[in-house]
Amino acid sequence: LGIENQQKVHYAMPLRHMVGDAFSYLKEYNELAVQNKKQKNWRNSDEFLSGLTAEDRLHPMITICIYYGEKEWDGPRSLIDMLKVPERFQALVSDYKMNLIEVRNSEYLKFQNSDVSIVFDISRFIYDKRYDKINDIYKEQLIPSELGLVIGAITESQKLIDDAIKLEKEGGKMNMCKALEELEEKGRI
């Protein structure tokens, strides 16, 4: 599993994912080929030539881009989106799809880890300026200061970061509603 954290849109991300995944596959292929060569696992010239036996399989590589920028992702989502291909040739061109998770459009995602849900929810609500929603859901709920630090970093709120660091040193938890009220009053969100 590969994770790419992006705060800015990267207009070559599908290509970057493809190359990274290809290098991972190539590394595993080379390791298998060396092992097969040492053990002389070849049953025929096809296996000898390819370096793999007919039964050899590589492990799947899954790469996910987590985009936490404030603006909507407007970059390509697959390799074909990056190419100038006449329509009549598009069916012949190999495509490579990128797995993209946008924090600001993550309401449809369900996470098993409640901390991840909190980070995505609060960050998304801050981006959408839906402070009322944060108040409705997280009213009086204390969250670990580490989560406040992550939310502050994602939303580029220095005040949230500073508050989280201060509370971290004191071993405390954060009330996001109170922290956001202070920020909203000061116009710093």
Regions found by a protein language model. Give the residues of each.
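Elongated, amphipathic alpha-helical interaction scaffolds
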Residues: 1-189
